[in-house]
């Protein structure tokens, strides 16, 4: 193949980048994730029905404003849900956005009780798992006296007041149930 080929527009395009010495590597998306995380690469998601055109930096003159060699693509925006994004990338992207947007709920009386009792149960019984701990804590909560329960309800009211000061516009909005297939 010639290193230059004429297009109908009459401008030469170099195909030197097709030379085997050019750093053309096949990457699995999962393998490329490290390069993306370290800032040595970028991820671009291509929706169904589109084909990406990759041009090495040495050929970037093809994209300058005066060049009529390639058709100019029109910008189209897609949501992540419209793109076929590998789950491990999508999960980390959603995790990053949710962590800044989501406001935590204030703990209720049982949650405060469970948090305190969970650690003590695990210390006294290191071989039990979380589901067993949950069952035991639930039983313990039901058997607690009114005075003990009142103490946790008062603690939860304190945390609720603190929460209102920190997040004045907060309103709990439960997730809608997804329809099971």
UniProtKB/Swiss-Prot annotation:
Nucleus in keyword set: yes
Gene Ontology CC terms: nucleus
Pfam families: HMG_box (PF00505)
Primary location group: nucleus
Location(s) in or outside the cell: Nucleus
PANTHER family, alphabetized: SEX-DETERMINING REGION Y PROTEIN (PTHR10270:SF161), SOX TRANSCRIPTION FACTOR (PTHR10270)
Other comments on record: There are three genetic loci for mating type genes in fission yeast, mat1, mat2-P and mat3-M. Cell type is determined by the alternate allele present in mat1, either P (plus) in a h+ or M (minus) in a h- cell. Mat2-P and mat3-M serve as donor of information that is transposed to mat1 during a switch of mating type.
Name of the protein: Mating-type M-specific polypeptide Mc
Source organism: Schizosaccharomyces kambucha
Organismal lineage: Eukaryota, Fungi, Dikarya, Ascomycota, Taphrinomycotina
Primary gene name: matMc
């Amino acid at each position: 193949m010639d290193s230059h080929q004429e297009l109908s527009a009459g401008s030469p395009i170099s195909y030197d980048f097709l030379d085997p010495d050019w750093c053309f590597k096949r990457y699995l998306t999962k393998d490329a994730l490290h390069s993306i995380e370290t800032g040595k690469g970028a991820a671009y998601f291509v929706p169904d029905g589109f084909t990406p055109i990759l041009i090495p930096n040495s050929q970037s003159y093809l994209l300058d404003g005066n060049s009529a060699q390639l058709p100019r693509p029109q910008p189209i925006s897609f949501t992540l849900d419209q793109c076929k994004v590998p789950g491990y990338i999508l999960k980390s992207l959603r995790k990053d956005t949710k962590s800044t947007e989501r406001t935590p709920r204030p703990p209720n009386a049982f949650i405060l009780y469970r948090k305190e009792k969970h650690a003590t149960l695990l210390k006294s019984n290191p071989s039990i798992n979380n589901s067993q701990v949950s069952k035991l804590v639930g039983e313990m909560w039901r058997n607690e006296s009114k005075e003990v329960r009142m103490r946790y309800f008062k603690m939860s009211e304190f945390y609720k007041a603190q929460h209102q000061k920190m997040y004045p516009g907060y309103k709990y909005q439960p997730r809608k149930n997804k329809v099971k297939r």
